[in-house]
Swiss-Prot record:
Function in brief: Interacts with VP4 to form the outer icosahedral capsid with an incomplete T=13 symmetry, about 80 nm in diameter, and consisting of 200 VP4-VP7 trimers.
Subunit structure: Interacts with VP4 and VP6.
Similarity section: Belongs to the aquareoviridae outer capsid VP7 protein family.
InterPro entries named in the record: Capsid_VP7 (IPR031413)
Domain of life: Viruses
Record-given protein name: Outer capsid protein VP7
Keyword annotations: Capsid protein, Outer capsid protein, T=13 icosahedral capsid protein, Virion
Localization of this protein: Virion
Any GO CC annotation of this UniProt entry: viral outer capsid
Length: 273
């Protein structure tokens, strides 16, 4: 396998493990449900040796490559461990989805369909706001928390920004929305990675939604309000990574210039605390 593919394959293996979609391949390069017979693992796209990450095939429908790949027998315990972990995550996700779906009907409302006065007193009102990432002239953490983008080629000087040098701080900015009441939390997500995040306007920081239940609830509500469908990549990010992986993904997304505004929706999301 080319060296440049190792991170890509490793990331696919990790995501498949956390999303519960990792499956087993036997010595004959055939899918199997018997963990003890597993010689390789597949992410759905790559058939991989779990020990050395050698790519046996780029596709489960083309299992003719590297048939004579031989690696240490020590890989079988590792494969078994990864498959069991994937199975546990799949079971946990099924349970969390069931819980989320029940809670969503009770906790999530669209403002144009239900009187906002009926929202619980302790409810936290969440709005959707545009988010941009900019190259600042002096990208220091201190200035990153205070300076707005002055790029004349863009027309979003009134938007809150995330500076690339300090991805977890939201600079003070004049919001271009006029909420009917004070809004302290704004929700958005990376257009490249689909990572859902909450922006705490009081503390000026970013909260990555590490809880699978919280991620599922918020993402489902936002996509429902946006009338959008969940793509496989977004679903993988939403349910798959652990808290540490979510933070890493958020850091990468926030620090990239490809982190653009994702749109703003008139509907409000009300989630009970």
């Amino acid at each position: 396998m080319p060296a440049h593919m190792i991170p890509q394959v490793a990331r696919a293996v990790v995501q498949s493990t956390y999303s519960g979609s990792l499956s087993a391949i036997d010595d004959n390069l055939e899918p199997t449900d018997d963990i003890d017979q597993a010689a390789y693992i597949t992410t759905g796209r790559y058939v991989v040796c779990a020990l050395c990450l050698a790519t046996v095939s780029d596709s489960p429908t083309q299992l003719s490559r590297w048939v004579f790949h031989h690696c240490s027998d020590d890989r079988r315990p590792l494969i078994r461990s990864m498959l069991l972990a994937s199975s546990r995550h799949a079971h946990a996700l099924r349970e969390s989805r069931e819980v989320d779906m029940r809670r969503i009907s009770r906790l999530v409302h669209q403002a144009d369909e239900e009187d906002e006065l009926d929202a619980p007193r302790q409810a936290r009102r969440i709005g959707y706001v545009d988010l941009h990432s900019c190259d600042l002239q002096n990208p220091t953490p201190e200035l990153a928390t205070r300076q707005l983008c002055n790029d004349p080629t863009r027309t979003h000087s009134t938007h809150p920004h995330l500076a690339r040098s300090h991805p977890y701080m939201l600079p003070t900015a004049a919001l271009d929305i006029d909420p009917p009441e004070p809004v302290t939390m704004f929700a958005t997500m990376s257009r490249t990675d689909g990572v859902p995040m909450l922006f705490n306007m009081t503390h000026r920081n970013v909260e990555v939604l590490a809880s699978p239940a919280a991620r599922a609830s918020l993402m489902y509500a936002l996509l429902k309000l946006a009338n959008a469908k969940l793509t496989p990549k977004q679903r993988s990010i939403m349910y798959g990574p652990s808290a540490n992986d979510m933070v890493a993904a958020c850091t990468k997304a926030c620090a990239a210039t490809t982190f653009r505004h994702v749109g703003r929706y008139a509907a409000r999301v009300v989630i009970e605390e």
